[in-house]
Structures are given as C-alpha cells and as structure tokens.
C-alpha cells in the first residue's frame, strides 16, 4: 500500500506521499508519484490503494472538479455519489486525500466524504504512524505544514514495511 499525509497550518496546506508500489510482499516500484495537483493547481490530491484504481479515481475526480468549477466539497460529494452507484467504481480499492485553500477531505472506498478534525489526514498502510507523528508535531512544535508532513512521512517510512522514503510533496499557500 502506501502512506499519504496532509497537514494544514498557517495559511499552508500540504499533501505528501511515499513512492512504494507493492505487489503482495514484493516491492515493484519505489518512485511512484501518488500526489498531484489538480484543477489549475488549486487542489492537491493523494491516493492510497491500488495504483490503477487510483488513476481512475483521479481522472473522475478531476472531471468533477471541472464540472463544479473547482468547488472541492461539491466535487467530492458528487464523486462519492458516483462511487456508491457505479458498479465499476464500487470495486475500486483506493482512498483519496484532497485539499484546497479551504478544506481537507478524505474520499473513501465506501463513497464517504470525511472532513477530518484538525485538518490532518493520514491514510494508507502507514497512516496511523504518520497521523501520530503529525499530531505530536502539530501540538508541540512551530514547524511548518510542509516540515510536519515530511517528518511524519519519514517516521511512517521507518516503521511501515509498505512505505518507503521516496517522497512526493505538494504545497498550497493561501
């Protein structure tokens, strides 16, 4: 699987992800880009789960963003509706973490849209490790969102065998 973490602090939101692609117990690729910018670089998105499934979701989510003129919440809710009702989408195994200047959201494989507490998202196999590290850093340091995301992803990569140290980090300042 993978680890994706999103942190929001001081007019900055960051989504960071590792690059490991695993097939069973085998590492197939170590430098996959699981975080990207969408909708005129105004939305950040990261995925955890099956790579092919995630690319399908990225394409569909970007189409929803275009349809709803970049309105993140509306696009996420419409994506979730499709996810629940479409026979193909229902079989996709992936999670999306998405963020813009106003909101941070998780779109789940069940078609749920969750706005997390404290604007902190951590998903994937190393998500609990990254969330723990990011929470501690948010509560006890003055580090930037980018520094917290990077450090928490490093900690997750040190602990989780399905997370490596190759990082893709995208940042929005607003």
Curated annotation (Swiss-Prot):
Its EC number is 3.4.25.2. Keywords: Allosteric enzyme, Cytoplasm, Hydrolase, Metal-binding, Protease, Sodium, Threonine protease. The keyword Repeat does not apply. Transmembrane segments: none annotated. GO terms for biological process: proteolysis involved in protein catabolic process. It comes from the Bacteria. SUPFAM superfamilies: N-terminal nucleophile aminohydrolases (Ntn hydrolases). This is ATP-dependent protease subunit HslV. The gene is hslV.
């Amino acid at each position: 699987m993978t680890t994706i973490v999103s942190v929001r602090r001081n007019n900055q939101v960051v989504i960071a992800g590792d690059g490991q692609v695993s097939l069973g117990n085998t590492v197939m690729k170590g430098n996959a880009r699981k975080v990207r910018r969408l909708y005129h670089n105004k939305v950040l998105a990261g995925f955890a789960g099956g790579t092919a499934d995630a690319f399908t979701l990225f394409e569909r989510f970007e189409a929803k963003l275009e349809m709803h003129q970049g309105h993140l919440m509306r696009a996420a809710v419409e994506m979730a509706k499709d996810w629940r009702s479409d026979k193909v989408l229902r079989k996709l195994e992936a999670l999306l973490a998405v963020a813009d200047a106003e909101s941070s959201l998780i779109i789940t494989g069940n078609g749920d849209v969750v706005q997390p507490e404290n604007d902190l998202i951590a998903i994937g196999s190393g998500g609990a490790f990254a969330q723990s590290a990011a929470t501690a850093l948010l509560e006890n340091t003055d580090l930037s969102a980018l520094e917290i995301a990077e450090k928490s992803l490093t900690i997750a990569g040190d602990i989780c065998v399905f997370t490596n140290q190759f990082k893709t980090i995208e940042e929005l300042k607003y």
